Amino acid sequence: TVIDVKCTSPKQCLPPCKAQFGIRAGAKCMNGKCKCYPH
């Protein structure tokens, strides 16, 4: 799931992804936007 959060590294995406999808969510930075992987 791509969320509207700008990023330069996956670390920046973990907090918003965890907030939205739960503590075990994974995150990647793709094309300057965060992509979350709910588990």
UniProtKB/Swiss-Prot annotation:
A cellular component annotation (GO) from this entry: extracellular region
Any Pfam family: Toxin_2
Additional free-text comment from the UniProt record: Negative results: does not block Kv1.4/KCNA4 and Kv1.5/KCNA5 currents.
Entry protein name: Potassium channel toxin alpha-KTx 2.5
Organism: Centruroides limbatus
Site, as annotated: Aromatic residue of the functional dyad: 37
Effect on the protein of changing residue 19 to Y: No loss of activity
Family annotation (InterPro entries): Scorpion_toxin-like_sf, Scorpion_toxinS_K_inh
Disulfide bond positions: 7-29, 13-34, 17-36
UniProt entry keywords in alphabetical sequence: Disulfide bond, Ion channel impairing toxin, Neurotoxin, Potassium channel impairing toxin, Secreted, Toxin, Voltage-gated potassium channel impairing toxin
Domain notes: Has the structural arrangement of an alpha-helix connected to a beta-sheet by disulfide bonds (CSalpha/beta).
Family under the similarity heading: Belongs to the short scorpion toxin superfamily. Potassium channel inhibitor family. Alpha-KTx 02 subfamily.
TM regions (residue ranges): none
Cellular location(s): Secreted
Known tissue expression: Expressed by the venom gland.
GO MF annotations, alphabetized: ion channel inhibitor activity; potassium channel regulator activity; toxin activity
